[in-house]
Every structure is written in structure tokens, then in C-alpha cells.
């Protein structure tokens, strides 16, 4: 009789040896570094099946081990839960006795925090709109650029679990060594203005009996109840974790020394602007203690040529963890193409012929560095546009069968299409990579948090230029299942494109 909890067989596929080795390891801390498209979620499902299979074979007379699986967004949490239940509920002998809710919880960090403090909410509601929306409504005269800047800084301070007083002290110290007097007064004035606005925001929350997401996590850290003691904690997309989320999980471990199983890809750490901290995955062992480390390097998403090109590109940043990703040996003519014209308009007009000759029912992503890059494509008269929640849906009258979407590089993460076209690959301030100057105060917030967590500071020289932009470009490249196109303008090519031209996998087509 077939074992329905066979962890080597997940969702109709046999797992590879690297996946199985990581699953069978049962040490206190496990870090699985998995490349794009290598089957991170199937590995997590396999791990849960392994835990239940082990329990069933050894200790079926006691309740199953309590498992917490954490994902980062509501959509990914729902998908993960559905996929886990679809696999484990096949074993009807186990679930005649136990209900999955008795031993497995699938949460986001916020839903977990909400569960922890549920009894202490005392009628408070969750303020989902947050600080930025508060500023837009209460400060209509404040320029939008300033609102975004304050909202970003506030988000970093909260997610990095740093106090603005500490930032002020570091600003004073930095002034003595590096800054001009005007830099000092400008940065101190910004923090003082932020403190006033935050005070007003906190009054607004109190008046409306509300709590925001960061407050939820902070309160949960202090109110952990023994009913939240777990035997296993599994974290998906670990590279996206913030210091505040890390501290919540660390506090949970004080209740019971659970076994930790984390799956992530440092090459795809692209949410630093929202509080993700790459040193938490690069210095994992320093955070959690002795760790068993595994790699999953066989991708099921894209062909070998694209794997080779993208891997060489990302590993030019020497701080990234080394991986040798292997792809499918699929031959498609011109898998990696640069379209180089004398102007952006020429490049975009050429899309008409590319779209016209694409296979039937192909899926296509147009990826920009910024959301506003859609304005460039909107000049194409042969395309029509329809806004949806996460992306812009595009249609072409002559090819209604094509499924075309525009997304920013950040929003493309986790998604894939047959054909990907990266637009705006130009060497400009708002090109790709972005040359927007890094904010000194943002960097100081990170610095304080890293020191407090006992982390080793990342050496910027070893990262090379544009380290986060490089990871973002890598994410955009690896959305393609079949072919990737880069749209460039002659004599204004992105430095990333100049790098890629050195590789034999890239074919450049020059337009007149």
C-alpha cells in the first residue's frame, strides 16, 4: 500500500536529491538556500509531510507535533495553506482522529501577531491604511514626495525596531567625522518633523481605538502566551524577513526550543526599502546558532542559457551566497535578446512586430523599474490598457490571444511568463539600475539595527555598486520561462546591459 505521506513525492512530482536531503535533516536550525524556480514551496510541503510521517511511524499514540508555517503575504499564505492541506489530507487514517487545525497553522507575521494579542485587543481594530494614508488625509498641503519620504523613514524605523533618539545620536556622531553643518541641520530637522507627525498619528490611532501593523508585531513580542509553543517553525521566503519579524520569532523560541526550517534566496532580497534585512539570511548562523545549510540548485522554470547568464550576473556581487543553478537544456533560438534603437520610441514601436510573431496564447510581461514606466508604453498606439489590482493588463487588436501585462520589477517577484521584456534599461537617474542617491538617514537606521542584532556589517565595497538594484534586475530576468528581451537606447545603455554584452548568451539587434 502506498504511503500517502511519502515526502519524496509532492504534488505529483518526485523531489530531487538536494530537496530530499534538506527535508530529512532534523537539526535545531536548517537553512535551505533555493534559487528562483527551484521548488521552494514543494520543499516546504515535503518537510511537513516528513514531520507527519516520522510522527506516524514513531509516536502515533500521542498528538502530532505542532507546526507553524509562516509566509509573507496574505495571498501566499492562502496558497501555501491550500497546497499543504491538499497533500496531507490524502492520509485519511491520520485525519479521522486529528483535525489539521489542531497541529498545523499557516500564518503571515501579521496574522500570527493578531492571534497572539487577540485577547488583549480590547475592542481595538487593525489600522490597515497606515501612516502614509494618515499623512495624505490629514496633511493635504504636504508635498507627495515628502509624504513618501516620511512614510518610508517611519516604516524603516518601526520594522528595524529602532528609536529615533538613537538615529539622532548617530547623526550627531556622523557630523563630527563626515558631514557639513547643513547636512546635520537638514537631517535633524527631518527627524524632528517626523517625530511631530508620528505623535499626531499615534493620537489618531488612540482616538480611533486602532493599532497598526508594526504596533501589532511589537505588542505580540511582549505578550507571547504558552499556547503559542511550537515543535517546528517553517519560514518561507526567509530573505524578506525584517528585524522586527525576526525578534518576534526569536521570542517565540523562548516558550519552547522549536526546530527552525527556513527556505529563502538571498539573490532575491529586494524589499530593503520596506524593512527586509539581507544580513539576517547572510549571517543566519549568527542569529540562530549552529545551523545545517542546504542548497537547491535545479530550476524548473527557465532554460540553461538564461540560468547561466543570470547566475554570472548576480554573483558579481561577492557578498551573495554562491550557488550553481542548473536549468533545463531547452533550445530556443534567440533566448536572450537586446533590442537597441536610436530612441525609446523606436524600441517600443518594434514591439508591434515582436508581438505579431509570438506563438498563440503566449503570456508576456513588460517589466519596468518603476510603476510609472507604464507611461512609456502607453505611447504605443497599437496597444490598449486596463488597470487591475497588481498589474496593468494590455491587449493588442491584431493578437487578442496574447496575455500581456505590465508590472514593476518589485511586483513581478514570484510570477512568471513565457516572454519577458524589460523596458527602460537606460543609464539615467530613473533608469535600471536606479541612480537615486541613497538616503543617509535610511542607512543609519539599518546600521543601528544591524549592530543591535549583533550582525556583521555588510562591506559595501565587496557588494559592488547597485547591490540591491542588481538583485532586482536578477528578479526581473528570472521571470521568463522561454525568452527575455531588453529594450535599450544607443549610447544610453544601462551598465547592467554593458555587463551582459560580455556574455555569449546575449544577442543584440540594432534598429535604425
Where are these predicted regions, by residue range?
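P-loop NTPase Walker
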Residues: 1-122, 478-479
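Conserved two-lobed SF2 helicase motor
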Residues: 105-111, 212-220, 401-411
Amino acid at each position: 500500500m502506498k504511503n500517502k505521506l511519502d515526502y519524496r513525492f509532492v504534488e505529483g512530482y518526485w523531489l530531487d536529491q538536494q530537496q530530499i536531503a534538506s527535508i530529512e535533516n532534523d537539526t535545531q536550525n536548517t537553512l535551505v538556500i533555493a534559487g528562483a524556480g527551484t521548488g521552494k514551496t514543494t520543499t516546504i510541503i515535503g518537510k511537513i509531510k516528513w514531520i507527519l510521517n516520522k510522527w506516524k511511524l514513531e509516536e502515533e499514540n500521542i498528538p502530532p507535533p505542532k507546526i507553524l508555517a509562516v509566509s509573507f503575504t496574505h495571498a501566499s499564505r492562502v496558497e501555501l495553506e491550500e497546497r499543504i492541506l491538499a497533500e496531507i489530507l490524502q492520509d485519511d487514517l491520520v485525519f479521522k482522529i486529528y483535525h489539521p487545525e489542531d497541529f498545523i497553522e499557516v500564518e503571515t507575521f501579521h496574522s500570527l501577531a493578531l492571534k497572539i494579542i487577540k485577547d488583549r485587543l480590547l475592542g481595538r481594530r487593525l489600522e490597515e491604511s497606515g501612516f502614509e494614508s494618515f499623512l495624505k488625509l490629514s496633511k493635504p498641503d504636504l508635498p507627495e514626495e515628502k509624504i513618501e519620504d516620511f512614510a518610508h523613514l517611519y516604516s524603516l524605523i518601526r520594522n528595524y525596531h529602532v528609536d529615533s533618539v538613537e538615529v539622532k545620536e548617530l547623526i550627531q556622531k556622523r557630523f563630527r567625522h563626515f558631514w557639513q553643518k547643513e547636512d546635520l541641520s537638514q537631517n535633524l530637522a527631518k527627524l524632528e518633523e517626523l517625530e511631530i507627525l508620528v505623535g499626531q498619528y499615534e493620537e489618531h490611532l488612540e482616538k480611533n481605538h486602532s493599532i497598526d501593523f508594526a504596533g501589532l508585531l511589537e505588542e505580540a513580542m511582549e505578550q507571547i502566551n504558552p499556547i503559542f509553543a511550537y515543535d517546528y517553525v517553517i519560514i518561507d521566503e526567509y530573505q524578506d524577513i525584517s528585524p522586527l519579524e525576526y525578534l518576534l520569532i526569536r521570542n517565540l523560541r523562548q516558550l519552547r526550543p522549536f526546530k527552525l526550517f527556513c527556505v529563502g534566496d538571498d539573490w532575491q532580497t529586494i524589499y530593503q526599502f520596506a524593512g527586509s534585512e539581507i544580513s539576517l539570511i547572510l549571517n543566519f548562523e549568527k542569529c540562530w546558532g549552529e545551523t545545517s545549510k542546504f542548497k537547491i540548485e535545479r530550476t524548473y522554470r527557465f532554460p540553461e542559457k538564461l540560468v547561466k547568464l543570470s547566475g554570472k550576473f548576480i554573483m558579481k556581487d561577492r557578498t551573495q551566497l554562491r550557488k550553481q543553478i542548473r536549468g533545463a537544456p531547452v533550445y530556443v533560438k534567440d533566448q536572450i535578446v537586446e533590442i537597441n534603437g536610436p530612441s525609446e520610441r523606436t524600441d517600443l514601436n518594434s514591439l508591434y512586430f515582436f508581438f505579431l510573431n509570438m506563438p498563440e496564447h503566449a503570456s508576456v510581461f513588460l517589466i519596468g523599474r518603476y510603476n510609472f514606466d507604464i507611461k512609456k508604453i502607453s505611447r504605443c498606439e497599437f496597444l490598449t490598457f486596463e488597470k487591475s489590482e497588481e498589474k496593468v493588463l494590455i491587449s493588442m487588436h491584431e493578437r487578442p490571444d496574447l496575455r500581456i501585462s505590465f508590472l514593476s520589477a518589485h511586483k513581478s517577484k514570484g510570477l512568471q511568463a513565457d516572454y519577458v521584456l524589460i523596458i527602460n534599461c537606460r543609464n539615467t537617474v530613473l533608469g535600471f539600475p536606479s541612480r537615486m542617491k541613497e538616503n543617509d538617514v535610511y542607512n543609519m537606521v539599518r546600521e543601528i539595527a544591524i549592530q543591535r542584532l549583533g550582525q556583521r556589517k555588510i562591506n559595501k565595497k565587496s557588494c559592488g555598486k547597485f547591490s540591491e538594484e542588481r538583485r532586482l534586475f536578477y528578479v526581473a530576468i528570472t521571470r521568463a520561462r522561454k525568452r527575455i528581451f531588453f529594450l535599450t537606447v544607443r549610447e544610453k545603455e544601462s551598465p547592467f546591459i554593458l555587463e551582459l554584452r560580455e556574455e555569449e548568451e546575449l544577442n543584440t539587434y540594432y534598429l535604425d
